[in-house]
Amino acid sequence: MSSLPNASQLDKSGRRIVVDPVTRIEGHMRCEVNVDASNVITNAVSTGTMWRGLEVILKGRDPRDAWAFVERICGVCTGTHALTSVRAVEDALDIRIPYNAHLIRNLMDKTLQVHDHIVHFYHLHALDWVNPVNALKADPKATSALQQAVSPAHAKSSPGYFRDVQTRLKKFVESGQLGLFSNGYWDNPAYKLPPEADLMAVAHYLEALDLQKDIVKIHTIFGGKNPHPNYMVGGVACAINLDDVGAAGAPVNMTSLNFVLERIHEAREFTRNVYLPDVLAVAGIYKDWLYGGGLAAHNLLSYGTFTKVPYDKSSDLLPAGAIVGGNWDEVLPVDVRDPEEIQEFVSHSWYSYADETKGLHPWDGVTEPKFELGPNTKGSRTHIQEIDEAHKYSWIKAPRWRGHAMEVGPLARYIIAYASGREYVKEQVDRSLAAFNQSTGLNLGLKQFLPSTLGRTLARALECELAVDSMLDDWQALVGNIKAGDRATANVEKWDPSTWPKEAKGVGINEAPRGALGHWIRIKDGKIENYQAIVPTTWNGTPRDHLGNIGAYEAALLNTRMERPDEPVEILRTLHSFDPCLACSTHVMSPDGQELTRVKVR
């Protein structure tokens, strides 16, 4: 395992490439890299270019309303901020939710996880590997044979089915309006799939569109709508009535519960017979594409998720923990309350602290904007052509765990769960690695394969399988508990602020689709005194700190060779593997800031 470079060791010579803007769930991102004469990335700079500011907006508001504000941080991972927020308030006020509410929250959270991962792979990430135009050259009969070889259990596998998909795609291309497929790099040699694999992937792209719109209906049953389903401090905002179908004010009945079960089975079939086989098929063809490990080979963090027994974190299906220095033999405990463990630094962020060599725990966090550019910045304040990363260069703060920059997300969760001995995860990972090695003729070990762009993408698919499988357990437990006579969905004993202490503080944690998510709150006189959120993109998109430690995005891009630097497919592959939501124009710049080309990131 190579050592993790410090910012002071990075080679900042060579050609500078700028990708801007890169739109993500927390705002807009910018990425700059230096490439050497061999087109290998030697320096990477990740910049957050929009200030969220919700922490400031929340001050002085009713903590029972915080979830509705913070939920708007993101419209893709909808609901996860609301869930984390109500957990923070409940922690501060010592509120325990009913068992039904725990199960319903689990179902809503896992629905999000499944939906988000499927949408990510097929509609955000797949086009970094799949060439839809090349699918026009495919033989539908050969595509059918490939589908049956890759996943014989999938029903949609006939030559006629793939011929119909190809015909639809051909009409689309011949219209001259490629839409979401326009501005791609379809002649770039970085694309290696045969036409039949491309056609199969395009068919699954369309199937995933149908699936994603159906599974989120679970949110409308339990949360009233999607996106941004309703939550509440003390439980969930939905009543239960199994006696009268469609009873007013009681959306949870056996008809709606059976509808939920049908959606779970559909997602389970798709994950097992389409999503996972597709990821392994892509990995098998791109078997040498093991770039993008970065921090994953060194430092990983998870708060734990999918708690089976309420308020018992030891029952998390994916456990909490931290790995430092690539030591998988030791998973360290994580305490989000400890001011020595989690701190945010701002020496390279557009914020101001009294002492910028020291970090602040979120309970004591300060959000004071200070936008200033370093002296070597090229361009102007409103049109930056090249950032000066030696100074402040991002609206994202720099969170650290015991001083270390950490990678968070599905890959972190899976490596930590594997190292912690979770049998379900070990079986999944071992099975997948064996399939990869068998299909490629390689003999890679876990540490060679998992800490990579491909490994990060596989971990997300495996987590989708775990989530949808465990949804069946939650559904059965919920129905069983209701039939046993328990109809409670909320604990309102402390709803009235007159029952609250004069001052209180709490923390809510969750594992959002993209990684570790924490909300820290201080309440005084019934109002929010301070609120801080550290989101997954803050961890992964962190700028450097005062000691030169680089973040997950920056580290993952290093040492990647690009086929054509003016068509940065490789940059997008690795950035997308962290599950950013990208649909914006990007620009590739020469060292003097002149635009070379304009592309669309899909």
Swiss-Prot record:
EC numbers on record: 1.12.99.6
InterPro entries tied to this protein: Ni-dep_hyd_lsu, Ni-dep_hyd_lsu_Ni_BS, NiFe-Hase_large, NiFe/NiFeSe_hydrgnase_LSU
Places the protein is found: Cell membrane
Class of this enzyme: oxidoreductase
UniProt main location, coarse: membrane
Quaternary structure annotation from Swiss-Prot or TrEMBL: Heterodimer of a large and a small subunit.
This protein's name: Uptake hydrogenase large subunit
Organism the protein comes from: Azotobacter vinelandii
